[in-house]
Structure formats: structure tokens, C-alpha cells
Amino acid sequence: MEKKRRARINVSLEQLRSLLERHYSHQIRKRKLEKADILELSVKYMRSLQNSLQGLWPVPSGVDYPSGFQGGLRGVSQRLRPGEGDSGLRCPLLLQRREGSTTDSANPQATSVLNPCLPAIWAPSRAAGGSHSPQSPLPLPGGLLESSTDVVAPHPASNCQAESTRPGFRVWRPW
């Protein structure tokens, strides 16, 4: 057991020596390095590497999170905003979302009009007399069709809003 451990140590020291010879070739000059010399040169190299990298990657703090989030949101917004000559596959992001928080409770005015790219849950809206709008088939998974009267409209939560995007339909949005 002890022989295997010593063999592993010697193999690792030999690898370190060959790496250090490449880096410190002007200082070593073909002399035989002892184990202590190899370890000292390794420590010296690691310290110089640590000092050279210290200013490159500062430790992130929680203060930078909001500005980083808003910067990322601006970049995503620019990528998703339709431009000239686009095929129309992109959709616009809210300018209000770029300004504020990710929670609607922070700024209730920022949720005036939403145009998300995600699919919506469609449900029939009620007309003035309490009757349903005209029936239209809804596509279901597996290619099944079902009448829209069988779909129950979800009840919006207190901070959710329903948008009217097509006549006779309400769209439930979780924000």
C-alpha cells in the first residue's frame, strides 16, 4: 500500500517537474530538481498565476444583480423585437418589463398591455346576456377536436389579467 502511494507521489512530482521546466527553463538549467525544489517552484508559479488573475474576474456582489438583469433583458428584447425584413417569427417584449422588477406587485401600472410569445389558454367569454359566444372547435393534444363550450375559463388571480385578443375569447395570463 505504501509503495503505491509513494509511486503516485513520484509520478505527480515528475509531471510537475516537466511542466515547470517548460515554464522556468531559464532558471532551472538542466540541473536535477529535488522534490522540495519542485514543490517550491509549483507554489511560486501558483502565486504568480493567482496575482495575475486577481483583477480579471472580480468577485460578483449582489449589488450588480439588478443592473445585470436589466442589461440581459435589454439584449433579449432587442433580439425578439421584429425588425425590417424579418419573417415575423419574433414578437415584441414589453418596454415596461425592462424598467422594473420581475414581480407585478412592485409596479401594477407596468402590466397595461402584454404581448407574450408563449401560447395562451383560450376560453369563451360571456356575452352581455350571460350566454356563450359562438362555438368553435379547439385543438387538443393528439389531434382531437372539442367544442369550446367544454372548456372552463380559469379564474384569474388577484394580480392576473384577462386580455381580449379576439372577439368572443378571453386569454388568461398569469401576470
Swiss-Prot record:
Cited function: Transcriptional repressor of genes that require a bHLH protein for their transcription.
Gene name of the encoded protein: Hes3
Keywords in alphabetical order: DNA-binding, Nucleus, Repressor, Transcription, Transcription regulation
Residue segments, region Disordered: 126-166
Quaternary state and interactors: Transcription repression requires formation of a complex with a corepressor protein of the Groucho/TLE family.
Domain of life from the UniProt record: Eukaryota
UniProt entry tagged with the keyword Cell division: no
GO cellular component terms attached to this protein's record: nucleus
Orange domain ranges (all copies): 65-98
Chain span(s) of sequence motif WRPW motif: 172-175
Feature: compositional bias, Low complexity: 129-148
GO MF annotations in UniProt: DNA-binding transcription repressor activity, RNA polymerase II-specific; protein dimerization activity; RNA polymerase II cis-regulatory region sequence-specific DNA binding
Gene3D superfamilies: Helix-loop-helix DNA-binding domain
Domain notes for this protein: Has a particular type of basic domain (presence of a helix-interrupting proline) that binds to the N-box (CACNAG), rather than the canonical E-box (CANNTG). The C-terminal WRPW motif is a transcriptional repression domain necessary for the interaction with Groucho/TLE family members, transcriptional corepressors recruited to specific target DNA by Hairy-related proteins.
Protein name: Transcription factor HES-3
Location in the cell: Nucleus
GO biological process: hindbrain morphogenesis; in utero embryonic development; midbrain development; midbrain-hindbrain boundary morphogenesis; negative regulation of transcription by RNA polymerase II; neural tube development; oculomotor nerve development; positive regulation of transcription by RNA polymerase II
Domain bHLH stretches: 1-49
Record lineage: Eukaryota, Metazoa, Chordata, Craniata, Vertebrata
